[in-house]
From Swiss-Prot:
Specifically dimethylates two adjacent adenosines (A1518 and A1519) in the loop of a conserved hairpin near the 3'-end of 16S rRNA in the 30S particle. May play a critical role in biogenesis of 30S subunits. This is Ribosomal RNA small subunit methyltransferase A. The keyword Membrane does not apply. One of its GO terms (molecular function) is RNA binding. It comes from Haemophilus ducreyi (strain 35000HP / ATCC 700724). The gene is rsmA.
Length: 289
């Protein structure tokens, strides 16, 4: 079967199962690299380097760059890059399953060396990948990611807005979230059907709303936003009684998007000390975040 030329870029056919859309607009690439501002003294790691649109200009500014690439053909291509192969450490693995803590520990990095992560993430795994990376927030100085524009809106959202959801709360619990630039579909080959945007995530050194156990923050936000059209009295009924919510300063007629991160942290800490007898084990659905 012939492959459409629109799906082929620099001799490589984009694979739908990997969510591959290759960045090709040089002006956009320049702006992203400028936002990353790579420094030789940093430990830089790229997720999903693809055909090297960001890899090459970043590697030109530093002596070493580590990349994680699942596509074996692209990983092999990077290992034999004509002028950067000696700078690159290529890890051929799924970033969703990669233990960043074990890897960084194995390198015996200087305690003061900043770990900085960037990438043009496949949109089909971007949300679960960010949740995976949040587990290692204490190791990371910053992250720059190309994402679907709608996802960036959710990351940056404020309470009382439609975009505000569980992804918003968990991202802003761990990180300061800063939108960087918007990117049109024409900047990619093949062009995606959605607009894109670049976001900067800067993990807090000290969490502004610490919780005793993040499990309970996950649980309360999952319950609230999986039923976001319901009042909190009903959405959180398996976790709290109406009297308990009122005691914690929650308006029973409010909905999930009306609470701040501080409110959710307060609820999570109360649950940690007073776990419910029955907690419905609701599956976390990333496409509903």
């Amino acid at each position: 079967m012939r492959t459409s030329n629109s799906k082929k870029h620099l001799g490589h056919t984009a694979r739908k199962r990997f969510g591959q859309n290759f960045l090709s607009d040089m002006n956009v690439i320049h702006n992203i690299v400028a936002a990353i501002n790579p420094r030789n003294e940093d430990f830089l790691l790229e997720i999903g380097p693809g055909l090297g649109a960001l890899t090459e200009p970043v590697a030109e500014q530093v002596e070493k760059l580590t990349v994680i690439e699942l596509d074996r053909d692209l990983a092999e291509r990077l290992r034999h890059h004509p002028f950067l192969h000696h700078k690159l450490t290529v890890i051929e693995q799924d970033a969703l399953r990669f233990n960043f803590r074990d890897y960084f520990d194995s390198l015996n990095l200087n305690h003061h060396q900043a770990i900085r992560i960037f990438g043009n993430l496949p949109y089909n795994i971007s949300t679960p990948l960010m949740f995976h990376l949040f587990k290692f927030h204490d190791l990371i100085q910053d992250m720059h990611f190309m994402l679907q524009k709608e996802v960036v809106k959710r990351l940056c959202a404020a309470p009382n807005s439609k975009a505000y959801g569980r992804l918003t709360i968990m991202a802003q619990y761990y990180c300061q979230v800063i939108p960087v630039l918007e990117v049109p579909p024409t900047a990619f080959k093949p062009a995606p059907k959605v607009d894109s945007a670049v976001v900067r995530l800067m993990p807090y050194k000290t969490l502004p709303y610490p919780v005793k156990d993040v499990y309970w923050l996950n649980r309360v936000t999952t319950h609230a936003f999986n039923q976001r059209r319901k009042t909190l009295r009903n959405a959180l009924s398996t976790l709290f009684t109406a009297q308990q919510l009122e005691m914690l300063g929650i308006n029973l007629t409010d909905r999930a998007e009306n609470l701040t991160i501080s409110d959710y942290a307060r609820l999570a800490n109360w649950l940690c000390d007073n776990p419910p007898a029955i907690d419905t084990n609701q599956e976390i659905l990333y496409d509903e975040l």
